[in-house]
Regions:
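C-terminal alpha-helical interaction module
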Residues: 1-135
Length: 135
């Protein structure tokens, strides 16, 4: 998961050649497709219990639509286009104490303002409006 997903978004975002970007995006979305299918039969990645693998995946998924989709050009599909991964992310977000650790405004500000080689104007987009609640 680290190479394909966690680091996959960075491999796409920092790619300096089309073939490197294409390879990273293809691998990333192949992994997301696989994870979407895997979550059809289990609550968490490794079954019924939360594991470190879930924590690692959540940190990438919670940033996906707000940052990686546009800033890193990981834009074949949004997280919300994956019903199981979207529900999984919202379920993780609803765990006690997790929501208070996620500040999307700060996350977006950090990514869009600190990576001048990707975003020379340092403009932080207003959207997307994301609701991680389990309504």
């Amino acid at each position: 998961m680290y190479r394909s997903v966690n680091n996959g978004v960075y491999r796409a975002g920092f790619a300096t050649a089309q073939d490197k970007y294409d390879a990273a995006v293809t691998e990333l979305f192949g992994a997301l497709d696989w994870l979407e299918k895997r979550l059809a039969t289990r609550r968490w990645l490794c079954g019924t219990r939360l594991t470190e693998a879930d924590v690692r995946l959540f940190t990438t998924l919670v940033r996906f639509d707000a940052v990686y989709y546009s800033h890193f050009k990981c834009n074949l599909r949004r997280l919300v286009d994956y019903p199981r991964l979207w529900r999984y992310t919202r379920r993780f977000y609803a765990l006690p104490g997790v929501a208070r650790t996620v500040d999307l405004a700060e996350i977006k500000s950090h990514y869009y303002r600190s990576m001048k080689h990707i975003n020379p104007t340092q403009i932080v987009p207003k959207g997307p409006a994301l609701d991680f609640s389990l309504r």
